[in-house]
Amino acid sequence: MKRLFIVVVVLVLASSILIGQELKPYTMGAQSSEALDVVREKTSQALVAAGFTILGEYQPAMDETRWVYVVNSTEMTEAVQENGELTGFAAALRVGLTVENDTVNISYTNPIYLGNAYFQKRFSDVEDKFLTVQDNLKKAMSDLGTVMDGAFGAKEGMTPKAIGKYHYMFGMEYFEDVVELTEFSSYSVGKSIIESKIAKGGDTQLVYAYEIPDHDLKLYGIALSGESGEEHFLPIIDISTPKHTAFLPYEILLMGNTAVMMHGRYRIALAFPDLTMTTFSKIISTPGAIEDLMRSVTE
């Protein structure tokens, strides 16, 4: 059964090679037969050796079969510094570990896919930096087991142009249609309020925080718990194989004196572009619930 599972995954990933310039949300980096705890340690070491800084890590949705590392690199920071504003969301990249059929899948958010989504028409100016990020991720995966290097997360990929203009359907939000959570009197006041409220715990827990040097930009990755949190919505939307573990955590971007988040109907759809309307209807309240949780740490 385990051998059959690996063969199926290889075939799914290999088909992505034929798509050429069409991109998918995730890359399967490697697969390992070792225990999750062992793979976690090896992954952490490999990422650092490949030039990444680990900003944070956590167990999404309190699921014992999953683990996420959030990383940053010099190239990612430089790209954001050159562009500022909403490109601050590109300051962090997620690496997901998932146990599926006794195999640990090590996957990550596709930096070229997200780069096109967050930089849009400006991505060509920073593409070389993200290609370096992609190459370094491949290097990190090379010592973690069977190297896969295949795209997944959608049956059909999207062109860079389509990703830059992406929305799920007519009437739904684009990348730039962010939710403005709170406007503070200043950037420093915003940082102080957000960080003091997160520290209180509850249904929001800080996974990482990263401030862009020489810019009034700070990105926070926040784990969401409670009855409307990750444990509620992730099992509903993450139903395909391989799993989209690197979808989480959700972010708040403090941009100057304003805290914003990507709209749930955009952020979820970008990570799960094949979601059917039937599945989307099952989480119809989730974008609003996420917004409420995020407001709880900004107001």
Residue ranges, per PLM feature:
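Sec-dependent N-terminal signal peptides
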Residues: 4-14
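Sec/Tat signal peptide C-region and signal peptidase I cleavage site
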Residues: 16-20
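Terminal, regulation- and interaction-focused segments at domain boundaries
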Residues: 21-62, 120-122, 140-219
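Soluble non-cytosolic domains of exported or imported proteins
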Residues: 33-38, 128-131, 284
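Extracellular/periplasmic catalytic domains that process cell-envelope and extracellular macromolecules
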Residues: 62, 87-90, 245, 254
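Mid-chain, structured segments of secreted extracytoplasmic proteins
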Residues: 65-104, 108
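Hydrophobic alpha-helical segments and helix pairs
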Residues: 106-152
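A cross-kingdom marker for long, charged
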Residues: 209, 213-299
